[in-house]
A protein has these predicted regions:
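Extracellular glycan-modifying ectodomains
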Residues: 1-292
Length: 292
């Protein structure tokens, strides 16, 4: 809108308090809901309260213990906030604190934190959208590579190399942060499009349904894969990871839900591995929960 553009261009501030205007056209999410501030978390300014850490650790340990009783390996995966990867584009008034970032540390549970690999790979290209909270498809590909290297045996496997992908950069409308500002048609950006050149995995169930929260899980099959069935409980970040990881498993099930754990679906499909993925900011400011 005109008012949004005026505040953006003339006053150098964003239209709403949820969005922080960074340097060089970058946008960042601030407080998504009360108590969940991504910037304070990524900068280490907002450490965990003891009760929060205990609740999250208990929940994750319970999920892993239940999976073990079913003969299923459980792995927790953490996708970093954009501000954790690109703090250099935050406004100059933001500074990191000495305290460590707020993340659970459940004892005895395998955790794959993708942050370090994404930071190391920033030189290959932009990994997150400037005006969206999410990584772009190049960032998703780097996250996929990191995950496949870090999974516990016998699920670990060498990831596909980048040169086996088709990579294009396309101009597209602004993402979720630009939409919050009512400026998605103004704040255009180039975004990576990454696809497997010769895919072997095929979607077989819910292929035409929208890929979104609370939708029917999507099932992929690859008869040429070595690894057994896997179930991904994930959020919006793994929508773009799905085509890559599906290449490695005989059957891959993707169920999109915020913080949730589809125990009934997991029990019914009985995978060998459950990957429970969380974006970093989802691990604070809310009571963790399971979905029956």
């Amino acid at each position: 809108t005109g008012l949004a553009a005026l505040k953006w261009n003339g006053l150098d501030v964003s239209f709403i308090r949820k969005v922080e205007k960074g340097r060089e056209g970058w946008l960042f999410l601030k407080e998504e809901v009360a108590g969940r501030n991504e910037l304070l978390q990524s900068l280490g300014i907002r450490p965990y309260r003891d009760i929060e850490r205990k609740l999250w650790n208990l929940l994750i340990v319970q999920r892993a213990a239940w999976a073990k009783t079913q003969g299923i390996q459980y792995v927790m995966v953490i996708v970093p906030n954009k501000a954790s990867i690109y703090p250099e584009f935050l406004p100059a008034r933001y500074h990191s604190a000495d305290s460590s970032r707020a993340l659970p540390d459940p004892p005895g549970v395998p955790i794959v934190n993708l942050t370090a690999d994404l930071i190391r790979q920033k030189s290959i290209g932009q990994l997150y959208h400037k005006n969206d909270t999410h990584w772009n498809e190049l960032g998703a590909f780097i996250g996929y590579q990191s995950l496949m290297r870090a999974l516990p045996p016998p699920f670990q496997e060498a990831p596909l190399p980048l040169d086996s992908m088709q990579v294009q950069w396309v101009t597209e409308p602004g993402g979720d942060l630009a939409r919050l500002l009512l400026m998605d048609s103004v704040l255009m950006e180039k975004a990576a499009r990454v696809s497997v050149r010769h895919p072997q995995a095929r979607c077989e169930i819910s292929c035409d349904a929208p890929f979104g929260p609370w939708m029917s899980p999507k099932h992929f099959r690859n008869p040429h894969a070595r690894l057994p069935k896997v179930f991904f409980d994930h959020d919006s970040f793994f929508k773009s990871v799905a085509p890559f990881v599906a290449e490695h498993f005989q059957e891959t099930i993707f169920s999109w839900i915020w913080q949730g754990f589809h125990q009934d679906m997991i029990e019914a499909t009985h995978p060998a591995l459950v990957v429970d993925e969380f974006v970093e900011r989802s691990l604070i400011g809310d009571r963790p929960r399971n979905v029956p």
